[in-house]
Amino acid sequence: MQAEAVTPKWTGHPLWLVGFRPFFPLAALAAALLPLVWMGVYSGKLPAPSLPMTVWHAHEMFYGFGLAVLGGFLLTATKNWVSVRGHYGRALQVLVAAWLAERLAVWFLGGSPAFLVLGNVFLVTLIALLMWTLIRYRDTDSYKDNFLFLIVLPLFLVAKALLLGGATFELGRDLTLGLFRMAFVVMLERTLPPFMKGAFQLTLPRIFVIDSAIKGLALALVFTPWLPTLLHSVLSLVLAGLLVTRFAYWSAHRTLPRLEIAVMYLGGLALTAELVISATSLKWVGALPVHLFSFGTMGLIIPAMMVRIAKGHTGRKVVFDRLDKLALGLMMVAFLARVVMPQVLPADYVRWLWVAACCWSACFALIAVRIMPLVLAPRVDGKEH
């Protein structure tokens, strides 16, 4: 608490008070644009970026959109976990400038010496800031399993290098997915119990052995690209079974009247489905495991979390109105169009891609409109951050 007392008060614009304020709108705007740009390139209506099309697509969805969300979330959460003021002001401005520079570099400068710098400054700086917070204030950390982030965060640098490495693209993609999966496993474990307590007055049972096994298996599966096929399949199926078991005794059925909480469970079940599908050798249309995770887990959970955090952390009551629920509904349609319908009607694959891209973009455009006024204004309860 002493550290917070001597921290100078930020007197600049409210946008720079805490990490989610600049990065959630940036992530939402990126998510609204990226699928439409991708479909424009995919269909030949737009010029291709400097990187190979598939590499650019995967990089921007994970390291553009995904890391803006994860970075904003962790910059906000870590300060609360260790009870300090956290990074704000100039530090956030530098991060945003680096993120914007990376978007331009990925499109225009892929493969050039300048890209090696501009394409990595954001990730390196973000990791350094987050790890500094977790290591410097580990004695006041309320979550002793935050050592998982000390493992996961630096591995994003390895995963990104592999993703951009040409012949190692699939290794990098799978490592990246495993790292995001690990982050979502931890986030769901920490957020669902208080959400269920607040919405339904339910105290979810915590079984240490199961919780620990889930995180341990998720960490092991980060290294999927280097695991023997049989071991990967066994670990994936065991983790899927444990997650389904926990969702069952965490009363997933009770969430149906509350869409904003139900999508959290649905996102977790999509993660489980991704594990099961990736454990099999069956052939599916359109990189199914990757899109189960991107549309199912990231797509369903992130919009709900953005709204919840943008309202709750600006001093407002967390209530999802009709427009918020419309955004979540649009993402559910996008999920069906991208994941389910290509398996049912593969002849219309490109049409389903367009439907999915448009619904995803509409969802995040609406989310951007909803949260922008909140992050640009001071807290309504008089608190600083």
Model-derived features with residue positions:
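Hydrophobic alpha-helical transmembrane segments of multi-pass integral membrane proteins
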Residues: 1-385
